[in-house]
Amino acid sequence: MAQFVQVLAEIGDFGRFQIQLLILLCVLNFLSPFYFFAHVFMVLDEPHHCAVAWVKNHTFNLSAAEQLVLSVPLDTAGHPEPCLMFRPPPANASLQDILSHRFNETQPCDMGWEYPENRLPSLKNEFNLVCDRKHLKDTTQSVFMAGLLVGTLMFGPLCDRIGRKATILAQLLLFTLIGLATAFVPSFELYMALRFAVATAVAGLSFSNVTLLTEWVGPSWRTQAVVLAQCNFSLGQMVLAGLAYGFRNWRLLQITGTAPGLLLFFYFWALPESARWLLTRGRMDEAIQLIQKAASVNRRKLSPELMNQLVPEKTGPSGNALDLFRHPQLRKVTLIIFCVWFVDSLGYYGLSLQVGDFGLDVYLTQLIFGAVEVPARCSSIFMMQRFGRKWSQLGTLVLGGLMCIIIIFIPADLPVVVTMLAVVGKMATAAAFTISYVYSAELFPTILRQTGMGLVGIFSRIGGILTPLVILLGEYHAALPMLIYGSLPIVAGLLCTLLPETHGQGLKDTLQDLELGPHPRSPKSVPSEKETEAKGRTSSPGVAFVSSTYF
């Protein structure tokens, strides 16, 4: 009998077929940042003040500036108050009465708001996301993050049920059509509902494409392939800065960012299914046909005897979530990893969503944020090889946290310094996220790896949901968000000292293996592909690419 791992060895770990697949999936990762972060550029701050309709309704021969003086008080800086207006005088009051009696009692705006005349439509000025509605711009991001959580829970099982290709195509169609529909919404409530819907598709996409990639790429290239795919997410952030700069009209920006999905209709024919998934479903003929195509593209010859001995893949034994808490050592690992993923998400999205709050041009800052993620993600591979998983995870978390803490003490009139610190923090959190995928998968035993990675993914999404709400705390004190983004990663990083090192160790298969302690393995005796595949096999996106602690 032959298993798929043996066939993959003959096809090649990373040939032309896998490179073509990587490119197809990189395009999807490249498009994803628009859905995550474009909203930030649609709600940028802009001058506004209460509408002065009552003045205009009088037949006063006043200039616009004089009308403003009569209707809107000034703040301490001498600018019109954005959320207050003078209480209107009686309808029959004359201009002399108004000037002599000085109607100067204030009240919240009740006649709408006015914005600069040359403004372009934005979510903020079209739906009046100001004053008592200001919180909605951050609440919308929490709704989006909640959609990511639902999408992860929904499309994960669906990916195993109907296949990787079908799931990816369905998600591509969903987030493209919903994204285009978002550009034509008549109300902000409908906009929020569609943001939730598109988030479910985007979350499922990140799950499905990593799964498909890791099931076709061999052990020696899996980690590098996944990191390369993640780097395209960073490149997408850089392009988003240019798009947002060029299209200030939020509806045009929404259409421009989502329409490219329509050009990917050829994925229906170009994207391959996972041969391993076909084998687990007993669809032998389709799997063999796909394997032969992969071998042909890679210019490799398949042994007829090996193909004749190919048998359906069998799913190994699995545990349940409660098993993660029954074993003392595993319970400690699980709780700490929950904390790590929670703060990974909190810090990463916290800095990303506050890209306009560091003092420099928001478009330039977004470009820099995307650019620094590429070396950050790539360098994480070398850090894990040089310093091990534990110390790399600890170092990146603490570094990211310290940058956020230091920002609190930097004066606002030094925007370059603040932005530089934020950039270093963004690099550290991006690297920490990448390390978490590898380290977490190696810490869980094989029978619980899929369950464990699924649960840490949930905690990551919870961190994302809370991130915009943490930003709202800045209304009470400007330092609170950065204090939280800084202190929690430092605490989580210090907790990593309690975790075991996994670099150079054999992967654990069962709970009993945890009792045996570490099993060091010489780098020269890297495990066979069959062994590593058996130990790393899973359908979880954070798991399948970890088949050995050497890469």
From Swiss-Prot:
Residues 1-20, 160-167, 217-224, 273-332, 376-397, 449-452, 500-551 are cytoplasmic. Glycans are attached at N57, N61, N92, N104. Residues 42-138, 189-195, 246-251, 354, 419-427, 474-478 are extracellular. Residues 537-551 have a biased composition (Polar residues). It holds the Pfam family Sugar_tr. Residues 511-551 are annotated as: Disordered. GO terms for biological process: negative regulation of fatty acid metabolic process; nicotinate transport; positive regulation of T cell mediated cytotoxicity directed against tumor cell target; urate transport. Keywords: Cell membrane, Glycoprotein, Membrane, Transmembrane, Transmembrane helix. Residues 527-536 have a biased composition (Basic and acidic residues). GO terms for cellular component: apical plasma membrane; endoplasmic reticulum; extracellular exosome; Golgi apparatus; plasma membrane. Optimum pH is 6.4 for urate transport. Optimum pH is 5.0 for p-aminohippurate transport. It is a multi-pass membrane protein. Glycosylated. Changing R377C: May be associated with a reduced risk for gout; variant carriers have lower serum urate levels and increased renal urate excretion; results in strongly reduced urate transport; no change in SLC22A13/OAT10 protein levels; no change in cellular localization. The chain crosses the membrane at residues 21-41, 139-159, 168-188, 196-216, 225-245, 252-272, 333-353, 355-375, 398-418, 428-448, 453-473, 479-499. Its main location: membrane. It is found in: Apical cell membrane. GO terms for molecular function: nicotinate transmembrane transporter activity; urate transmembrane transporter activity. Ubiquitous. Highly expressed in kidneys and to a weaker extent in brain, heart, and intestine. In kidneys, expressed in proximal convoluted tubule. In kidneys, also expressed in cortical collecting duct, whereas glomerulus and thick ascending limb exhibit no expression. PANTHER family: SOLUTE CARRIER FAMILY 22 MEMBER. Belongs to the major facilitator (TC 2.A.1) superfamily. Organic cation transporter (TC 2.A.1.19) family. Anion antiporter that mediates the transport of urate, orotate and nicotinate in exchange for organic or inorganic anions. Translocates urate and orotate across the apical membrane of proximal tubule epithelial cells and involved in urate renal reabsorption. Possibly involved in orotate renal reabsorption and nicotinate intestinal reabsorption. Mediates urate uptake by an exchange with organic anions such as (S)-lactate, succinate, glutathione and nicotinate. Urate and orotate transports are Cl(-)-dependent. This is Solute carrier family 22 member 13.
